[in-house]
Amino acid sequence: MSTDSDTTPDTEEAREQLIDLAADFYDQFADGEVPTMTIPTRTKSNIVFDEDEQVWVYGDRNSTRSAKTISGAEKILKAVYTIDFLSQQLEEDRSSTLRELYYLSESWDLDEAQFNTQDESNNLIEDLEIVSDVKREDFHMRPEESGAKVMGPLLLREQTNRGDREIHCQDDVGQGGYQIPNNPDTIEFLDNDAKFVLCVETGGMRDRLVENGFDDEYDALVVHLGGQPARATRRLIKRLHDELDLPVTVFTDGDPWSYRIFGSVSYGSIKSAHLSEYLATPEAQFIGIRPEDIVEYELPTDPLSDSDVNALESELEDPRFQTDFWEEQIELQLDINKKAEQQALASRGLDFVTETYLPERLDEMGIL
């Protein structure tokens, strides 16, 4: 276990920010004020487009946690206990998962300080990120493993608690690829021959691309998103774009939920809009599956469900999708009343996606 002298400046800064936050609560008490904590309202109606950064961020509407009410007082109490835990964790240079924090709270001496659900503890960590301006990774808090992986011509060095490791994301890994760590800022890019990043929603399609040698033939960094991408995955994608100047493309199923996967990569998510500048890659381009692909290739489809239709209509009102391209595609999908999976391309043969669909789309987009 590391001592105080071993902790990094980032760790010290994170701890100081937490202590300052707790001190602010104390000062409010000392001044005879009711303690409060103000955070941006995390709803779709409170995100605005940042013209400078080209990402969606929280607007001016705020919500206030106030000890004037029982529920507000309990939230602030839980915040204080959590700050104490995080401060001690940083002092000892340890880490924990979001799940562990939820269970660990059961050992706290006040029942009112304990979390009732994991969503409650997760949301509090997000609140603390916002008010302290420190990312949860710098609190040494991590989610459960996302399982997201990278395959392609990239040599990197990863810092681990067992020392540094140099890994080539083709030569030194099996077909499963290199697993993205919880904090990708511990990675240093050493060398690469990649021409672009291809983010893939499903594991089945990712495996098809690797088996067909797409990463090798086209010098692609294939990033498996694993559904809605974790923060670590989005951070790595942004770093690959910003630091290696690689174009980023996103390849998903053709349904409204998958379009939101693209949205989280490109524009940022509503839940983490306070980190959009850190996580979002606004230059990312959507490959498909587009509704027009469903029509053009006569792909096997399923009918849209009521929830699909509601989601598409909601996206038409979502500022992240208010572009000519997305409005045209969503209107088309509502008109044809169909959706399709990535693997529906296999109806034209197992090699169609790597020999025809992706090369043609990437050429149209100016990537190849």
From Swiss-Prot:
Listed InterPro entries: Spo11/TopoVI_A, Spo11/TopoVI_A_N, Spo11/TopoVI_A_sf, Topo_VI_alpha, TopoVI_A, TOPRIM_Topo6A/Spo11, WH-like_DNA-bd_sf
Topo IIA-type catalytic domain segment(s): 9-148
CDD domains, alphabetized: TOPRIM_TopoIIB_SPO
GO cellular component, one term: chromosome
Binding site for Mg(2+): E201, D253
Pfam families assigned to the protein according to its UniProt record, in alphabetical order: TOP6A-Spo11_Toprim (PF21180), Topo_VI_alpha (PF20768), TP6A_N (PF04406)
Enzyme Commission code: 5.6.2.2
Active site: Y103 (o-(5'-phospho-dna)-tyrosine intermediate)
A molecular function (GO) term: DNA topoisomerase type II (double strand cut, ATP-hydrolyzing) activity
Catalytic reaction annotation: ATP-dependent breakage, passage and rejoining of double-stranded DNA
GO BP terms, alphabetized: DNA topological change
Protein name per the record: Type 2 DNA topoisomerase 6 subunit A
